[in-house]
Amino acid sequence: MPRTLLTTLVLLLTSLTARAADGPKVVCFGDSITKAGYPKVLGEILKADVVNAGAGGHTTAMGLKRMQKDVLDAKPTVVVVFFGTNDCRLAEPEVAVPVAQYEKNLTTIADACAKAGAKVVICTMPPINPEPYFKRHKKEPFDKVGGLEKVCEEYRAAARRVAEANKLPLVDLGAQLAKTPEWMAPDGVHPTPAGTKLIAQHIAEAVKPLIGK
């Protein structure tokens, strides 16, 4: 066998062996609910390399600005996209992302991940408990458009549309976590330790088929 061909085959086999050893990588892309720690539990469930790319207070618009560095540069096998709780903060117009733009941003994120060769899982935003939430945020902007739950459901519907239009797995945490209110911390937004585990379990079911588990 010619030396150059042999060298090429050795390099190819070495590359394939390294990739197999590395195994699948999952990047969890989101806000403070992601940052709170479900990716660590997800990694334990999947026995896979799971990266926590959550950032407190972030919207889809903010996420797009850090996506290359925090997500794509990691060369993920799967990206779990989980935004919405901050996008719908109508009481802070400097933060809020209108629902139509939220839908476009989710589509842009999904398209960029697919272009990079990663599979995508879309999550809907979880429930919000209005009593503690409105101790921190003004209620009037929500009341003007039909109330907090109506607003939240509009953002969840947008996430569902993105998943459906792009034939992506959907984890409907808005519906799933509503059945287990113990997931929620007293602030009405973030997960308890038990909630972190529940979120990881729900997401794991969508990710497993994508990484051959």
Predicted regions located by residue number:
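Sec/Tat signal peptide C-region and signal peptidase I cleavage site
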Residues: 16-20
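Sec-dependent N-terminal signal peptides
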Residues: 4-14
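A structural signal for the hydrophobic beta-strands that form the central parallel beta-sheet
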Residues: 28-29, 52, 122, 185
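Ser/Thr-centric signal marking residues that sit
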Residues: 7-8, 34, 59-60, 124
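A short beta-strand-loop structural module common to alpha/beta enzyme folds
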Residues: 48-62
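Alpha-helical cap/lid subdomain in secreted, periplasmic
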Residues: 22, 41-45, 62-213
